[in-house]
Amino acid sequence: MTWHLLPQNSAYTFVNFISSENKVNKLAQVEISITNSETTLEKLPSDNPQSGFEDRESGNAPSWILTRRPGWQSDENGLATKSKSALASTIYSHSILNPKLYEIRVLELQPDLCDSSPIRVLLSKAFISDPPKYQALSYLWGDSSEKVPIFVDGKRFNIGKNLFAALKCLRLRDSSLLLWADAVCIDQENVSERNFQVRLMKQVYSSAEQVIIWLGESEDDSDLAMDLITTWAPPNAEETNMPELLETVISKPNVFDLRSWHAVRRLFAREYWFRAWVLQEIVFSNRAMVRCGTKQVAWRDLGVVQLKWEQLKSEPENFHLLTPKQLKMVTLTFFSAVSSITLQHLARRQPNIVPRSLFRLLRAINASQATNPRDKIYTLLGFEEVSVLNIKPDYTKPVERVYAEFVQAYLESECKLNILL
């Protein structure tokens, strides 16, 4: 079972993976060479003021002097720029976290003075035991090579395009907004800080006033999809029986518009739903809101819609309430990610109805994706079923060791071999 959490979904691949020492060692060496780099080459013009510029008529290239300067590197254009680690250390130097005090950082998103104003945030520290009122972002990091600059405490700082879009969409016109977003609030270049902050993820999301589930910008008729979900979740929908709910829904125009239902399927095929961290971020939230572009719907309503659709599909006596075409639209809608999260949500709040199970947790996380394979283990550490295994996140450990230690702890705790299936 756990083998499938690794790349290529194969127990055979896992055996080869952990036996291939050179692969892991080389990866580790690359990480060390990058993160521990103190000096890099920089190109500077020579003392001749004219030599730093190309003679446009002759086409002669300028002369350069190679020099070393700590914390600087050359970009793709040959220009001297501060390295990522140097920029990060500058940003976080005034807000170093004390793990003994269980501190986190929160960001204050500054108001939008005009539509074209750059995004500016202020960082501050807080105790997770007594946090301010903040909202936690749950989002997809996306392509790490696509970066967009913002200003953190007045200093330029690069973030992913998807997080940038979220901040731009959430930014208020006349007041600031207190948020938590891992890419900014955790020094990603500081491994020891990451190790400790990952242990606090459950508290970060459970202490938030609200978790904002950011699906991305509006595209592929996502506005239609969000509107359709809202239509299926009228007030008291949870207590409404199926005939009454369908009567309410069908009375509204364009509810079974084919274009809208295709849009719903695309919405739930977005990469966000396959993130390994989604389960923990939503399950432990006290209140969650799904945002896609400018549209939003409460997570609770989304869960109600999913349960109602499942009920409609599982009770043949309801089939006559819809035409064959309408029923097909409901039954073909992809909702497995929401279903898994809803099930774990119930297990936290009503364990007498849905018993907690470590094996069920592993199955829920099995099909998820993570840029760092270690995260498919570490994302489970907030769950009681896993916390008893006493596993601590450590991003310096080789991937195969992280998985081997987890399997050993599972076997010792559960005394079952089903994890090997």
What are these regions (language model features)?
Residues 176-187, 205:
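Active-site beta-strand/loop microenvironment that shapes enzyme catalytic pockets
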Residues 155-181:
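Active-site palm subdomain of RNA-directed nucleic acid polymerases
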Residues 2-19, 28-30, 64, 82, ...:
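Residue(s) in the substrate-gating loop at a strand-loop-helix junction
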Residues 28-32, 37, 45, 62, ...:
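Non-catalytic, regulatory and substrate/membrane-recognition segments associated with hydrolase enzymes
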Residues 152-161, 390-420:
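Short secondary-structure subsegments characteristic of cysteine-rich extracellular domains
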Residues 14, 75, 84-136, 140-143, ...:
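Metal-ion-coordinating, acidic/His-rich active-site neighborhoods
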Residues 7-8, 21, 73, 205:
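Long tandem-repeat architecture
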Residues 20-26, 33-81:
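Long, intrinsically disordered, low-complexity tracts enriched in Ser/Thr with interspersed Pro
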